[in-house]
Design a protein with these regions (language model features):
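Conserved small/aromatic sequence motifs within transmembrane helices
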Residues: 1-145
Length: 145
């Protein structure tokens, strides 16, 4: 399902889309597209707060795989698409355990794992790990080639 995802702006207007070799978004600490305030709200995950509106509207949940742009749907193998049946979340397995350190394929694999093992207990673990990850700013800016 397509929906507009709310976020605080953290990049300069008309910033170019910079991708790594694996197709994932560049999130380096030296990213020239990110504003000074943007660096702060990203490191503290405050840029995600507006997505609570998406949760209230029913487009997202608190926990689930992060939503991807629609033009990415054709890059998934058929057996990977299982995670697309799960409502996307503000935080998820990848954000809690890897934040920005997992490459594109690892993120897909982790989203598939979550979709196949979804449970209240796993969601509680993800929430607790997300809190720890945000408080200790783990894996915020990881440069991968």
């Amino acid at each position: 399902k397509s929906f507009p995802m709310h976020k605080f702006r953290s990049m300069k207007v008309n910033a170019p889309d910079i991708r790594l070799k694996d197709g994932s978004t560049y999130n380096g600490d030296d990213d020239p597209r990110v504003t000074k305030l943007g660096r702060f709200i990203r490191k503290t995950s405050l840029d995600e707060i507006p997505q609570i509106l998406n949760v209230l509207k029913g487009d997202m949940s608190l926990i689930g795989p992060r939503p991807d742009p629609l033009d990415w749907l054709d890059k998934y193998k058929e057996e990977e698409k299982v995670f697309l049946n799960v409502r996307p979340g503000i935080t998820g397995y990848n954000q809690a355990y890897y934040r920005n350190s997992a490459d594109a394929q690892e993120k897909i694999d982790n989203d598939v794992y979550y979709a196949k093992n979804i449970s209240f207990a796993l969601d509680v673990k993800i929430i607790l790990k997300t809190i720890k990850t945000v408080l200790y700013r783990e894996n915020v800016n990881v440069t991968r080639e």
